[in-house]
Amino acid sequence: MAKSSKDIQLSELKDLISQLNMTIKTLNETIARQQQENDNLKAEMAWLKQKLFGSSSERRAAPFPGQMGLFDGEEEKPLELIEPEVVSLPKKSRKKKPTLKEQFENLPTKQVPVDTLSDEDKICSICGTQMVPIGTEIIRTEIVYTRPKLERIEYIATTYGCPQCKDTEEPQFIKDNGRPAFIEGSYVSESLLSLIAYQKYGLYLPLYRQEKDFLQLNAPISRSTMAKNLITAAQEYLQPMYDFFHRKLLYRRFLMMDETPVQVLKEDDRRAQTKSYFWVIRTGEDGLNPIILYNYTPTRAGENARRFLNGIAPGFYLMADGYQGYNKVQETNRCCCWAHIRRYLLESIPKGMEKDYTNPAVQGFLYCEKLFAYERSYREKGLNYKQIYTRRLKDEKPVIEGFLAWLKQVDPGSNGKLKKAITYIRNREEFLMTYLEDGRCSFSNNLSENSIRPVTVGRKNWLFSDTPEGAQANTLYLTVVEMAKAYGLDLYKYLNILFEQRPSGDMSDEELEKLAPWNESVKELCSVK
């Protein structure tokens, strides 16, 4: 039976209603998605403003000793948070501000008598007698700058001949050529290159600016000359020290690593804009002499980390960030950086909800704050690593267990940053408790991040390395300079000692040990005074 026109119209209307409902549903989903994107962008803007204009510290001052809460305001306990015993922090005494004399006590002092009175001024106004000195006092102190200077030294070689044999068929001669030049064919001395290296790697002063400074001293030393000599000296004299430090590092059981991108212009078969990497590999908090090494590689492949640690005994502890490439390092106990976890959670707290302890981001962050508070208290009390091991198991393990329980049930909802934080933490869940196994294990990767900072600061000034050889030389100088800093040495003096002593691959480890920054003689010669 044919449908009537009314039936056809009714069917068409139903189809139209169905289409409209689908359109409404699609539009509602689009609106919800755009609203979520809008909220995420607002949160991103708030985070960027905080990064640009707010405090960079992740710590929050407690209102009174022992308070583990993060934010000021009414005290509310976060939902389902366990509360282990609180460790009270000792009250810090404010350090007394040093006097002017104390600030500059290590500077050489010269006393200059004041003599501005004429002979007439020194006649007594009552009786007319000539006055005599009866006492002195210091009326002011000034710091005077003496501009550095460069000198040209000409070494004169004397030739000696035998007076008895001079008229024979075999006259005898000998010439005193002295010590070989620091760098063959170059006028650059040990002291000059020490200054150039100190200014570039200690003060982050680029070579083009040093070139201008030398011109003011009537010395046209080009940046290309400086760069060439820096590379040559690094290869000849710093590489043996670096290899010695590396051998020492492979005997250690607690290590830390980090990496950062750099630009190297003239790498084979690679565009100049391609990222290369500097790595820092350093010893951890084991109470032994710190060793800090830098390494250059064209890529970020985890194989580079594995290759650098080749030869180390299995079972060592490695603290690193979340980069998966570190998984290439086999037979190691991986530790997770709790500072990274705390940072992710802090950045996921929505603006205006800092006091809302029902917010999952705040809850997760409070767990981290409690752990950091315990760690600070252990350092304040001066606990040794055995005591730290015991206290961590008693204080911190229950907190981490509560954190893991929170992690299993937490719902990030529409908070994109919290989703990212949760994913980051879950990918590292198996490493969260590794540091509890030994009191010498680091709780965070802050030490290696602090060690990689000179690279990032220098990168802003140097901008790039021209060649792989230059990049490798940079890592050698950074190693020497940062090692000197770790032992409180005068950077220029230590560089100068190494260049004057000229370490070589022919030296034994016992000989190289005498040039290490932890050597007592080196400490005395390179003290900051």
Residue ranges and their predicted role:
Residues M1-E184, A227, M256-M257, A320:
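Short, flexible loop/hinge motifs at secondary-structure junctions
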Residues A2-K6, D121, T159-G161, K166-K529:
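Catalytic center-proximal scaffold of phosphoryl-transfer enzymes
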